[in-house]
């Protein structure tokens, strides 16, 4: 049986690293084979592209350049890591995937959605996530968390208005596709966030049990 593909999304400071720990615990407890990965990145070549995308630099990065770099990394990621794992029946948990492109390069940067659609169809095709968990926090809280980080990347340093568009974009994605995209209120306590994530995973696992 083909594995299941779950993406984890959210703005900067939404707590994805902690959420990944909770997801890993739940999968281990339920003895579900899985791999954890991330975007941009996930393979040696894609990780090199990640550095090009996220490293702060004096030269400004053209919006189209950023978009194409992200999709180049995604093509490699899919071919070398995601698709082989799914074909083996392994679950794939990815820290960011296609929704981030629509939100960051589309909504927040004002990118061409028609171009995004074409790239998504060409690069991703039918390999879209079976489910997506969006960690939602008010931008103010996310920014408070970001400033506590020892290292901040190029996206961390974007304006408040940019990050507000990111939050709005993820909420719009959830509203447009509520069956696939589920919101987790990540402004709550860690115990609450863990409980919400476990509840969503349990529902998904139960629903997918019929695919066996």
From Swiss-Prot:
Keyword terms: ATP-binding, Kinase, Nucleotide biosynthesis, Nucleotide-binding, Transferase
Any one Gene Ontology BP term: dTDP biosynthetic process
Domain of life: Bacteria
Entry GO terms, CC: cytosol
This enzyme's EC code(s): 2.7.4.9
GO-annotated molecular function: ATP binding; dTMP kinase activity
Recorded catalytic activity of this chain's protein: dTMP + ATP = dTDP + ADP
EC class of the enzyme, as a word: transferase
Matches recorded under Pfam families: Thymidylate_kin
Signal peptide: none
Binding-site residues for ATP, renumbered to this chain: 10-17
Function according to Swiss-Prot or TrEMBL: Phosphorylation of dTMP to form dTDP in both de novo and salvage pathways of dTTP synthesis.
Recorded family membership: Belongs to the thymidylate kinase family.
Protein name per its UniProtKB record: Thymidylate kinase
